[in-house]
Amino acid sequence: MGFVDFFETYMVGSRVQFKQLDISDWLSLTPRLLILFGYFYLHSFFTAINQFLQFINTNSFCLRLHLLYDRFWSHVPIIGEYKIRLLSRALTYSKLKIIPTLDKVLEAIEIWFQLHLVEMTFEKKKNVQIFITEGSDDLNFFKDSKFQTTLMICNHRSVNDYTLINYLFLKSCPTKFYTKWEFLQKLRKGEDLAEWPQLKFLGWGKMFNFPRLDLLKNIFFKDETLALSSNELRDILERQNNQAITIFPEVNIMSLELSIIQRKLHQDFPFVINFYNLLYPRFKNFTTLMAAFSSIKNIKRKKNRNNIIKEARYLFHRELDKLVHKSMKMESSKVSDKTTPPMIVDNSYLLTKKEEISSGKPKVVRINPYIYDVTIIYYRVKYTDSGHDHTNGDLRLHKGYQLEQISPTIFEMIQPEMESENNIKDKDPIVVMVNVKKHQIQPLLAYNDESLEKWLENRWIEKDRLIESLQKNIKIETK
């Protein structure tokens, strides 16, 4: 996805929406945009330092220089031994103290960023109301007060889905997060910092919850269907703390244009189920993550076998990609698969160093017994005497109010509300409907990819019907 497309799709919306922003809108938006950019700048700065320190501690070339440095000073009398100890202590201190501290700082910046963004978009907005539908299951990430690695699957209606999932996650966690001052005080005193529950999103070949530079690079230059392998995912889960992981199987944000393209493609692929309120799910991230869970739990999976329906799905996805991204170069996804052969250093010193670095024991991964299926719909409530749905031809009016499904942009959601009550009333309110349904994960761990794909497809059929049902049965009470 190019920069212009990314900016229009995720940040400001269409050019028409962008032109509607006047000077007062920009004056109110600018301070908030600067705050968010400040988080991005600090995160990028500390990430650069962290990666540099990790590079000089683990890179084969740097280890070779370290060896040459030691050999040189070993021939210098008196001060040579001091120089060798000085570098060794500096590297050890950076590895054992500075890098873990920077990891905690980066973790804190990511959480404060999400807390601030949640506050800007959902928590303190009078014109934005979130409703959990009747019959929804509660999100539960803990067992015996211990956080569990939890999978959530969700439809994709807006870039604000990321913030909304963070909002639901934070509301479901009893953990108290440090303020910035408390965090700095604990760092200064050298006190142990408690592990915070983590939420990550799996997509674009990354696990993330912050707009990092490497993520933006993938968004701009690579295919959005890029996925991590099951071995890579297992390695991440065993190195990091237990975390909640959210997947958007649709990959792309649902829009009228993509819905029309999907319906046209369905005429050529009658084997593929047609959805009216969703995009057809992509399976790769889901199947590889489930394979990683199975590997962690030592559960043997059934073998895959070829079938016609699976091939039809892949052809459908390929044609959809071609239409949505006409200018995309398919070679971009191949670049990430190529690996540079490591520098081979025939020296026991280097081997010993590498063993010390990689000797960390894998962490215990506690997998939640449930998968949480989250459904999100955004509505704008408008007062009108008549209405027409250009997609389905049937738009219900609720006591003079029309419910319009929307995909709000970041600019639209972070824009502050004016203090005047008249200004608040003049704005059309946004209603967010959320449904949560849980499914047992244990039976799925033995499934092969085909069975997992079918399971996810069935969940999408249910989700499509649910959205249709919510649209018809929603009621607006007026005073």
Swiss-Prot record:
Major place of residence: membrane
Write out the transmembrane intervals: 33-49
Any keyword Methyltransferase?
A: no
A GO CC annotation recorded here is: endomembrane system
- Keywords for this entry? Glycoprotein, Membrane, Sporulation, Transmembrane, Transmembrane helix
Q: Name one GO molecular function term.
A: acyltransferase activity
Q: What are the glycosylated positions?
A: 285
Give yes or no: UniProt keyword Membrane. Answer: yes
**What is the protein's membrane topology class?**
Single-pass membrane protein
In which compartments does the protein localize? Membrane
Q: Name one GO biological process term.
A: phospholipid biosynthetic process
User: What this chain does, per the record?
Assistant: Involved in the organization of the outer spore wall layers and especially in the assembly of the chitosan layer.
* PANTHER family with a match to the protein in the record: 1-ACYLGLYCEROL-3-PHOSPHATE ACYLTRANSFERASE-RELATED, PROTEIN MUM3
Q: What is this protein called?
A: Protein MUM3
Taxonomically, what lineage is the organism?
Eukaryota, Fungi, Dikarya, Ascomycota, Saccharomycotina
Q: Which gene encodes it?
A: MUM3
